[in-house]
Amino acid sequence: MQQLGATRRYAASDLVGFLACEHLTQLDLRALDAGQAPAAADDEQMALVQAKGQAHEQAWLERLRARHPDLADVTRAGPDLAARLAATRAAMAAGAPVIYQAALCHGPYVGHADFLLRTECPSALGDYGYEALDTKLARSPRASFVLQLSFYAWLLEHAQGVAPRSMHVVLGSGRELALRVADYAHYLRQVLRRFEAAIAAEPAPPTYPEPCEHCPQCRWRVACEARRVADDHLSLVAGMSRQQARRLNAQGVATLAQLGA
C-alpha cells in the first residue's frame, strides 16, 4: 500500500499479505498513518529470488516480443503512476496485441500485470478485449497466484467493460496455465470485503505477529521477531505449532517462562 498525496492505494500484494497475516496489514497501515515506510532487512536470498523472477519475466517478454514486434511496453512511460495508467489505456484503445507491465486502476486499487494479452472477445474497446498473464518462479500454482490474477481480471473488467474469460500464469518450468475468471470471482469479492472491513475498522482490530509461511518474505519480519522475543512468546519453542500454542494459552500458559514453571 502507498500514500500518494491524499489518496491511499492498495495493490494485489496487500490482499495476498492480508490473507497470510492480518498483523502485516495493520503494521502497514500504522506506518502510513505515521508517514513512514516499512524498512526491510537486507536479505541476500530474497534478492536472489527476485532477480530470478525478473529474469523469468524478461525471458517471457522477449518470447512475446519475437512473436509481436508491436508489443506495447508501458515501462517506457516512466515510473509515474498517472503516466503508466494513461499509456496502458492508450495501448488498450489502440488494440496492441500484448501490453507489458500494464497499469490498471479502480477506486483505491492499483494493479501492475506482467502482461495483457489481446483476445478476440468483444468488449467496450471494440471487437477485442484483454486477459492478464503473470510469470511466477514456482513450478506449481499457488492460491496467491489465483488471488493476484483474479484481482487483475477484476480491474480489467472495469477498464474494458466486460470480465475477461480467462487469466494465465507461466510457471518457472515454462508451463502456461489458463484459469477461468468466473470460477474465482466470488472468492475475490469475499477477500475484498474482508480487507476493506479490516482497513476501515475503528479502532483497529487487535493482531499479533504469529509466525506464518509469509514471514520469510515479509518486510516486517525483523520487527516481529523482536516482538516475539520481547514477549517470551511460545512460538520460540522449536516445532511449536500455532494450534499447540493456542491450547497452552487456553490453559493459562502464554510465555516460555510459564511453560517451564
Regions found by a protein language model. Give the residues of each.
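Secondary-structure transition/capping motifs at alpha-helix termini
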Residues: 121-128, 158-162
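Active-site ExK catalytic segment of metal-dependent nucleases
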Residues: 101-103, 112-118, 127-139, 148, ...
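Accessory alpha-helical DNA-binding modules that contact the DNA backbone or grooves
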Residues: 231-232, 240-261
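Short helix/loop capping segments that flank catalytic or ligand/cofactor-binding pockets
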Residues: 27-28, 113, 124-126, 143, ...
